[in-house]
């Protein structure tokens, strides 16, 4: 068995904390995915740096947990309805330190070089339970339901030959990706200060002020029943996550191709989103045979931090400060399958994405939350794209996370991944470039959760591969991964190229 130690970390200064603190789960938190997230940061490290890195992370976490205070404790029911992140004076957060770098275990656990060669694939890691804090891996599961007192967070430092895989677990109610990125940058700055003996970063108390996202609820007898909790659509097939790379030069070509001739502005995001939607629909249409006159479900997570204006919010505000705009409910006319595939020009489809994104405002969000406040059981309102039929897409944009610039004092991450052993069909994660230097052509990476038996059709498609480079299998469903023997390029899908 690998050597492992667990620390039960108190937030710095815990001795003087109140006996109990409760941080309300916001009305908006209920609309996110009811699951755990586990993001892994990958560091390149010499053996001589590892012990010190573990101590630095421990000290940095103690200070950061005293700032992002809702990370310490459990989610509990409130007596008057709803839920709260509940921190008691003696609450702790588990920090595991595991050593997977013994020479005799070289055939059991990958090195940093092995991970780098496979673009930091979860398949290369093998059984994610070895690298994680069960049951806090991604996926809708009873342990994550807020009525079951879920633990809010845990951390695990896995030292490997040549590096470190630092796994950060948190309940999705705790943070969206940009809230998590704010937490990571705060942690990195705290670690950097500990290493260099410099002043620690400040923490804006408004980072925990999410009162504007908590709407007044009517009396219990005036509330209404919401929909049944969403379940996975029966038509879905076994999925896997495929990793693709869009070089910056190719993204620029796509934007030029998708820009309307009338001078209407679109973004690079609009261009690649339109291209993705068109081609993923075109390639799979012969299999799923959608009615050309029907419409498809497109959902994108919009970061509201930049869209809040009355008043503005600090960039590191915690919780879920995002809104999932969906094509069926947005005040924009949806395209049909035929229009998505070919009848609309790429410019028209990109312009639709821009109108969809622009339809999300602080005012629209407020109206939605006022409606949500009237629902009796808000836990049934969580977003679940695999409850929609095949060909549905939920795209989440991580481009502003900028994790590779976070200097922990002992190293900067080479990249990060949302580690997965459960595939939610229809999800697309847009990762920021690993190399942010202007002269580099390294662009965004895309983890596309796709039907396994159709994967090779996408990888080999000429129109798709003209822009998107295949980088290998990013993740497989746990039941399938056991058949893969922990190696990439198995199960009939080619490895990275």
UniProtKB/Swiss-Prot annotation:
Residue ranges, annotated region (Disordered): 477-497
Keywords carried by this UniProt record: Calcium, Metal-binding, Transferase
Record carries keyword Calcium: yes
Bias-annotated ranges (Low complexity): 485-497
GO molecular function: metal ion binding; transferase activity
Listed EC numbers: 2.3.1.-
Pathway where this protein functions: Secondary metabolite biosynthesis
Signal peptide: none
Domain of life: Eukaryota
Annotated Ca(2+) binding sites: 221, 224, 386, 462
One Pfam family this sequence matches: Transferase
InterPro entries on file: CAT-like_dom_sf, Sec_Metabolite_Acyltrans
Binding site residues for CoA: 255, 303, 396
EC class (word): transferase
Function: Acetyltransferase; part of the gene cluster that mediates the biosynthesis of the tetraketides fugralins such as linear fugralin A and cyclic fugralin B, volatile compounds that play a role in the asexual reproductive cycle but are not involved in pathogenicity. One of the key features of fugralins is the presence of a double methyl group, which is only rarely encountered in fungal secondary metabolites. As the fugralins cluster does not contain an independent methyltransferase, the PKS FGR1 is probably responsible for adding two methyl groups to the same carbon atom.
Stated family: Belongs to the trichothecene 3-O-acetyltransferase family.
Protein name, as recorded: Acetyltransferase FGR3
Species in which this protein is naturally found: Gibberella zeae (strain ATCC MYA-4620 / CBS 123657 / FGSC 9075 / NRRL 31084 / PH-1) (Wheat head blight fungus)
């Amino acid at each position: 068995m690998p050597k492992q130690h667990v620390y039960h970390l108190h937030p710095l200064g815990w001795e003087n904390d109140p006996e109990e603190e409760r941080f309300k789960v916001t009305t908006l938190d209920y609309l996110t995915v009811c699951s755990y997230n586990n993001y892994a940061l990958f560091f390149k490290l010499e053996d001589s740096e590892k012990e010190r890195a573990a101590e630095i992370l421990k000290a940095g976490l103690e200070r950061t947990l005293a700032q992002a205070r809702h990370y310490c404790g459990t989610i509990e029911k409130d007596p008057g309805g709803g839920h709260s992140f509940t921190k008691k004076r003696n609450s702790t957060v588990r920090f595991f330190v595991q050593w997977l770098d013994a020479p005799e275990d070289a055939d059991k656990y990958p090195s940093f070089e092995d991970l780098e060669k496979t673009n930091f694939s979860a398949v290369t890691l093998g059984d994610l339970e070895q690298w994680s804090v069960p049951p806090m891996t991604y996926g809708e599961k009873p342990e994550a339901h807020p009525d079951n007192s879920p633990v809010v967070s845990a951390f695990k430092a896995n030292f490997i030959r040549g590096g470190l895989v630092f796994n950060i677990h948190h309940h999705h109610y705790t943070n969206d990706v940009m809230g998590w990125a704010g937490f990571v940058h705060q942690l990195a700055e705290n670690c950097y200060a500990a290493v260099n003996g410099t002043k620690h970063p400040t923490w804006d108390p408004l980072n925990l002020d999410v009162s504007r996202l908590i709407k007044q609820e009517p009396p219990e007898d005036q509330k209404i029943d919401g929909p049944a909790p969403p379940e996975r659509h029966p038509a879905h097939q076994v999925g896997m996550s495929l990793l693709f790379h869009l070089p910056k030069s190719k993204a620029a070509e796509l934007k030029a191709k998708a820009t309307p001739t009338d001078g209407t502005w679109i973004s690079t995001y609009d261009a690649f989103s339109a291209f993705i939607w068109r081609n993923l629909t075109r390639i799979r249409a012969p299999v799923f045979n959608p009615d050309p006159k029907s419409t498809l479900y497109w959902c994108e997570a919009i970061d509201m931090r930049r869209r809040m204006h009355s008043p503005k919010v600090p960039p590191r505000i915690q919780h879920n400060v995002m809104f999932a705009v969906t094509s069926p409910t947005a005040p924009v006319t949806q395209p049909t399958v035929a229009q998505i595939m070919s009848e609309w020009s790429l410019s028209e489809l990109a312009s639709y994405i821009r109108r969809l994104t622009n339809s999300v405002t602080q005012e629209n969000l407020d109206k939605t939350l006022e409606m949500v406040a009237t629902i009796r059981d808000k836990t049934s309102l969580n977003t679940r794209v695999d409850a929609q039929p095949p060909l549905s897409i939920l795209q989440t944009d991580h481009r502003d996370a900028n994790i590779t610039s976070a200097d922990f004092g002992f190293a900067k991450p080479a990249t990060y991944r949302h580690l997965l052993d459960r595939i939610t069909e229809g999800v697309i994660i847009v990762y920021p470039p690993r190399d942010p230097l202007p002269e580099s052509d390294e662009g965004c990476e895309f983890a596309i959760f796709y039907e396994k038996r159709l994967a090779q059709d996408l990888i080999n498609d000429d129109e798709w591969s003209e822009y998107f480079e295949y980088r290998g299998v990013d993740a497989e469903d746990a039941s399938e991964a056991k058949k893969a023997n922990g190696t990439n390029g198995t199960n009939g899908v080619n490895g990275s190229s």
